[in-house]
């Protein structure tokens, strides 16, 4: 019985994609409008959620941003803020921002500098789609890699955060 519990527990832990305490989020990032943002200011009294876009033309990624936008009020209950990471030129990212109207910073991943640290680069032209929650010190709190037309990670992040039960 202990063996089965141990195996089950190992499976559950490995499937949540939890990561050790290496600091992976940069101290400073620049959004596509040229604004320098410090991680400490983003994370002040908030949990930073990084959303990576597989590509600028990924329809599944765009739909997910639209759904997250619809749930902003719910996510604000548990002090969540977002940053979107994309590998594309600034002009294309700005066109995307206009299209999805997602009211959080978009970051251009120049030369895969950020995604490489997170093991999310899928060179030569894409990122691995992911949702990552960061602790206030820049270490990873939770992550889920991958999305498809059958699985968006929305439910996983909602279940993990359980914002409806925050006071």
Regions found by a protein language model. Name each.
Residues 62-101, 112-116:
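Structural microenvironment flanking redox-active thiols in thiol-disulfide oxidoreductases
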